[in-house]
Swiss-Prot record:
HAMAP family: KdsB
One Pfam family per UniProt: CTP_transf_3
InterPro entries xrefs: Cytidylyl_trans (IPR003329), KdsB (IPR004528), Nucleotide-diphossugar_trans (IPR029044)
Compartment(s) where it occurs, according to its Swiss-Prot or TrEMBL record: Cytoplasm
Protein name: 3-deoxy-manno-octulosonate cytidylyltransferase
Principal location: cytoplasm
Protein source organism: Acidobacterium capsulatum (strain ATCC 51196 / DSM 11244 / BCRC 80197 / JCM 7670 / NBRC 15755 / NCIMB 13165 / 161)
Cited NCBIfam families: kdsB, PRK05450.1-5, PRK13368.1
GO biological process terms, semicolon-separated: CMP-keto-3-deoxy-D-manno-octulosonic acid biosynthetic process; lipopolysaccharide biosynthetic process
GO cellular component labels: cytosol
Keywords carried by this UniProt record: Cytoplasm, Lipopolysaccharide biosynthesis, Nucleotidyltransferase, Transferase
EC number(s) from the headed UniProt entry: 2.7.7.38
GO molecular function: 3-deoxy-manno-octulosonate cytidylyltransferase activity
């Protein structure tokens, strides 16, 4: 991977309906966005990391912290559309879409995400982690099922696969919202209209699957907590404080 120019982009909007201004909410005394940026830089695998936002409040935060940021249009339909705006002005081989609500990312997550690009046919990658029992029916925890070769078959907020006979299936996998794209695949995503399933599930990655574009799902060690609610915020804060000890 050292020969590839990998650019990390953190799409950061403050219009979240479930947890308004969540990327700027404080966790252990620092805005969540600062934790995410630091985690991305600590991976050691991204040549550059920058914030992409449509909010002046986020731009001001970046200026105060000395973090690279770029202003993107408000009408971007998804985080990946925002990454594509960045790609039009900054060249790279691989673009990593880093969710601004994942402050618990570690270098191991980035290693797992980027390793599949050693295979030339891989165009898009993302991650899965074990799904805990209390997350299986939680629509905020997106489940993923894959083919034997790691290609994603489907992502859903519903419980997939459905254990019809209650046989005690224990292999549920949760999607971790970290994506990496070769430039051509990123362009293809951004030039396609939002798809039917994408709009139903509110999951941008379904735009690729509905249009026949493979997503390689790498299995990552451990799990994280994506911050969608006040409860998530408190749980992440406790875990990050313990990690700092």
């Amino acid at each position: 991977m050292s020969s590839l120019n990998v650019l990390g982009v953190i799409p950061a909007r403050i219009g979240s309906t479930r947890l308004p201004r969540k990327v700027l909410r404080e966790i252990a005394g620092e805005p969540m966005l600062a934790w995410v940026y630091r985690a991305a830089r600590a991976s050691g695998q991204l040549r550059q990391v920058l914030i992409a936002t449509d909010a002046e409040e986020v731009m001001e935060f970046a200026r105060q912290k000395g973090l690279p940021a770029i202003f993107t249009p408000e009408d971007c339909a998804s985080g990946t559309d925002r990454v594509f705006v960045v790609a039009q002005s900054i060249d790279a081989d691989i673009y990593v879409n880093i969710q601004g609500d994942e402050p618990m990312l570690t270098p191991a997550h980035f290693t797992a995400l980027l390793a599949p690009f050693e295979q030339p046919h891989v165009q898009v990658t993302t991650l899965s982690v074990p799904c805990s029992e209390d997350e299986i029916a939680n629509p905020n925890a997106v489940k993923v099922v894959t083919a034997a070769d790691g290609r994603a078959l489907y992502f859903s907020r519903a419980t997939i696969p459905y254990d019809r006979d209650a046989a005690g299936f224990i292999g549920y996998r949760k999607h971790l919202g970290l994506y990496a794209y070769r430039k051509a695949a990123l362009r293809r995503f951004a030039t396609l209209p939002p798809s039917r399933l994408e709009e139903i599930e509110r999951l941008e990655q379904l735009r690729l699957l509905e249009n026949g574009i493979d997503i390689h799902v790498a299995e990552a060690p451990g799990s994280t907590i994506g911050v969608d609610t006040e409860e998530d915020l408190r749980a992440v804060e406790q875990l990050l404080l313990e990690r700092k000890k």
